[in-house]
Amino acid sequence: MLRISVIARAEDTTITLEGRVVGPWVDELRHCWQQLRVAGRPVRVDLDGVAFIDARGRELLGEMHADRAVLVTGDVMMRAVVDEIAGRVPRPDR
């Protein structure tokens, strides 16, 4: 399950995610993000409450990052995932 909370302010919009970014929840997050893009405000994605991100979730977050969304987290493990998505560290061979 994934909880998606949106806080829109004059300067930006924050999407706060809690749970697992997997399966059908990836589609729900994509739908939410596409609606927010229309407003044209910068988007921040708060990943502090995320426990797991599957391959499709990582792909979507990569698309969001490429579209200038800022991925933020204070969690050490999630920071490694964000760095990988943002291309700051190479992805390990699997």
Task: Describe each model-derived feature in a short phrase.
Residues M1-R94:
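STAS-like cytosolic regulatory interaction modules
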